[in-house]
A protein has these predicted regions:
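Mg2+-dependent prenyl diphosphate-binding active-site environment of isoprenoid biosynthetic enzymes
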Residues: 29-160
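N-terminal amphipathic/basic leader segments beginning at the initiator methionine
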Residues: 1-21
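Membrane-interface helix-loop junction between the first two transmembrane segments
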Residues: 21-29
Length: 160
């Protein structure tokens, strides 16, 4: 599993590096936020969802290609968007040994700023996940199915 996790992390790193550069070109503060999101996303986790997806794909297709690596990166971005919002809702101080985004920015600015920024930051990760899925190179009909599932998840959670 570690071998596949590293391959996924390489793709995730490449995607986030490009996005961080673009964000920094736009504004230094936004670039810093993207850097913090990159650090948050790379805190050591199991990457079970993305690794399972990669292994299932390899089992059916016999190989790992760029398309599935983009999808796996999207899965990680999506998962971390949920975790970031969960940290805010639960008012967690730490996630995997590091400060949560809302606490980090609350300490630097104020509570309202940190909380608001965390909502936007989670949404940024969600948007990056959608971008990774959309640009994966899979057929449009498959991408639409995946994006429909992603949109349905928050609705189901809200009904719990």
């Amino acid at each position: 599993m570690d071998k596949y996790g590293l391959v996924i992390e390489e793709r995730l790193s490449s995607l986030l590096e490009k996005e961080t550069e673009n964000a920094t070109d736009y504004h230094d503060f936004i670039g810093r936020l993207y850097g913090d999101l990159r650090e948050y996303t790379f805190r050591r986790g199991k990457r079970l969802a993305s690794c399972s997806t990669l292994l299932a794909y390899k089992g059916f297709n016999g190989e790992v290609d760029d398309r599935i690596l983009d999808v796996c990166a999207g899965i990680e971005l999506y998962r971390h968007s949920i975790l970031l919002h969960d940290d805010l809702v639960d008012d967690d101080e730490e996630r995997r040994g590091g400060s949560t985004i809302h606490k980090k920015y609350s300490h630097e600015h104020d509570i309202r700023f940190g909380g608001g920024l965390a909502v936007f930051a989670g949404n940024i990760l969600y948007a990056l996940a959608v971008k990774a899925f959309s640009s994966s190179g899979f057929e449009s009909s498959k991408i639409v199915k995946v994006l429909s599932l992603l949109c349905a998840i928050p609705q189901h959670v809200a009904h719990l």
